[in-house]
Amino acid sequence: MNAQLDNQGRLRHFLTTEGLPRPLLNQILDTAESFTGVIGKSVKKVPLLRGRTVINLFFEPSTRTRTTFELAATRLSADVLNIDVAVSSQSKGESLLDMLRNLEAMQCDAFVVRHGDSGTAEFIARHVRPGVSVLNAGDGRHAHPTQAMLDMFTIRQHKGDFEPLRVAIVGDILHSRVARSQIHALNGLGAGEVRVIAPRTLLPRDVETLGVRVFHDMQAGLRDVDVVMMLRLQRERMRGALLPSEGEYFKLYGLTEEKLSVAHPDAIIMHPGPINRGVEMNSAVADGPRSVILQQVTNGIAVRMALMSMLLGRAGGGEDA
């Protein structure tokens, strides 16, 4: 059984999109849909998690992810604590497990964890007491499942059924936890074809085992696609000369209107952020009519509300606070 699920097949933790059954993936998207109305109200709160406590443990910097997790929890009426790891007891030599035990003793209900090492969220999930949930906000190169689900939600809003879709993921696949989670989610939801487009130096050796078609040429890879998902070049994770220069990368793999002309006329453009303009795409594409990048940010709140409600409370957004 998937370690994220309880013995009745319900979410206990949310650590990865890999291996999740299609009905559960759709339930997450359906639940997120129920919260979109809440986000649009003047009073953006429901009382589902009143009395619950969520602790954000971010060992890596983040703007969008941390902010939307905090907004999601507060809009469900939970109490939120943000731990500044740089000045926490861990910076004084305390182990991760000891830190976890002390925070658990404060009777929290969930940890939202971002860490530079793959597997950290799963490690914490294995050691928390029963009744405490862990949400993975990104761990090393391994996974970023909530980003993937907000991407799936955005795609469904624009395209509906996943089965006829051709989706291209472009850029630094090798270092991207987002790409892995996107691929697992797209395949889990039955997308017609998932493509990855990147130079050989930015592809993992086992990429084809993930159920994707590999392209090294942008024009060939983008032909007739319905969704283009661009990725950030993760210079901070690169070791060695994987690229000749950012200018050369943009020439070959940066998204422009000219390169986009071979995609389906209604193709949407996505990016998990932050965007490096002039490297991954130009401003005409990023700010153009087919870009849904800011909608992805908005949808992050609804999707994270959905996941917290499924883990900690009653799913659905029908009540006012």
From Swiss-Prot:
Biological processes annotated in GO: 'de novo' pyrimidine nucleobase biosynthetic process; 'de novo' UMP biosynthetic process; amino acid metabolic process
Name the record gives this protein: Aspartate carbamoyltransferase catalytic subunit
Function: Catalyzes the condensation of carbamoyl phosphate and aspartate to form carbamoyl aspartate and inorganic phosphate, the committed step in the de novo pyrimidine nucleotide biosynthesis pathway.
Keywords recorded for this protein, A-Z: Pyrimidine biosynthesis, Transferase
Transmembrane segments: none
Annotated InterPro entries: Asp/Orn_carbamoyltranf_P-bd, Asp/Orn_carbamoylTrfase, Asp/Orn_carbamoylTrfase_sf, Asp_carbamoyltransf, Asp_carbamoyltransf_Asp/Orn-bd
The protein's assembly and partners: Heterododecamer (2C3:3R2) of six catalytic PyrB chains organized as two trimers (C3), and six regulatory PyrI chains organized as three dimers (R2).
Pathway linked to the protein: Pyrimidine metabolism; UMP biosynthesis via de novo pathway; (S)-dihydroorotate from bicarbonate: step 2/3
Enzyme class: transferase
UniProt-recorded Gene Ontology molecular function terms: amino acid binding; aspartate carbamoyltransferase activity
Organism listed in the record: Alkalilimnicola ehrlichii (strain ATCC BAA-1101 / DSM 17681 / MLHE-1)
